[in-house]
Amino acid sequence: MLKRYLSITKPGIIFGNLISVAAGFFLAAKSEPASFLLLLTTLVGVGLVIASGCVVNNIFDRDIDQKMKRTQNRELVMGNINTDAAFVYALVLLLNGTALLFQVVNPLSAVVVLLGYVFYVFFYTMWYKRNSVYGTLVGSISGAVPPLVGYLAVTNYISLEATLLFVMFCLWQMPHSYAIAMFRMQDYRDAGIPVLPVKEGIAKAHQHMKAYVVAFGVVAIGLFMLGEAGYEYLAVSAAVCFMWTRVTFQKVDYNNYIQWSKSVFKMSLLVVMGISGVLGLELIPLPFIH
């Protein structure tokens, strides 16, 4: 039973988001005092709130999930978990995560994570995902909140750098999500989800993805230009952004779009891990680098 309740929190999504939380935290910690305990508390708090959002998403997406091969065996679709119990579970996760951030980290982090939760649950899950081709864009707003909360956990104020970080992860979400939609396009068609590749076609989605990847690279380098990140960050971010751009700009059609979109997706993960990793490493004094 414990395994079933764990599965509806979508641990993979939580882990991916916590990497971006750490990225924001590490970036802020370059100029503000921080501690490992603060990082751990922030990760736990944000993780609980994300888990709650994923549970609610599972509850409301039962009708969609049963139409998709990838999701038709989820616990709530199969009736293995009571819906009312899942709602209570989501509420407990949300209250504990928010309270932890509010009391131990700072109130601003708690407020921002709640705003992200509202966007994900009420705007994205309940409406835009089902009814609009712009659902991915709305979802990108909530998806960019975790790194922002990581940053605010250290600074407790919104700065130009924090705003740039938020915009950067909004931009990252778009080609990342479109890539997923492309290699799972039949599932999205079966469920009637109006994502851009399904509604407007592969060529249109490809154009959008190229634009977002380029914009992401510009903003990523912008963090260095503001003096918030070091030369190690510049080298790594430039390298991963170049690789992501190179893959994204490859020719794509109906014969190779599945393989191509999987490559774009994998590169998007490498980009986040590379940027997050180098921001963490820059906090460590390395005499042979500095």
UniProtKB/Swiss-Prot annotation:
One example of a Gene Ontology biological process annotation: heme O biosynthetic process
- The scientific name of the source species is Vibrio campbellii (strain ATCC BAA-1116)
The membrane topology term of the UniProt record is: Multi-pass membrane protein
UniProt-recorded name of the protein:
Protoheme IX farnesyltransferase 1
Cellular localisation: Cell inner membrane
List the EC numbers from the record. 2.5.1.141
- Which Pfam family is an annotated match for this chain, by its short name? UbiA
Molecular-function annotations in GO? protoheme IX farnesyltransferase activity
Pathway, per record: Porphyrin-containing compound metabolism; heme O biosynthesis; heme O from protoheme: step 1/1
Top EC category: transferase
**GO CC annotations, alphabetized:** plasma membrane
Q: Indicate the transmembrane segments per the record.
A: 8-28, 36-56, 85-105, 108-128, 131-151, 152-172, 211-231, 269-289
Its predominant location is membrane
Role this protein plays: Converts heme B (protoheme IX) to heme O by substitution of the vinyl group on carbon 2 of heme B porphyrin ring with a hydroxyethyl farnesyl side group.
Keyword set, alphabetical order:
Cell inner membrane, Cell membrane, Heme biosynthesis, Membrane, Transferase, Transmembrane, Transmembrane helix
Keyword Lyase in record? no
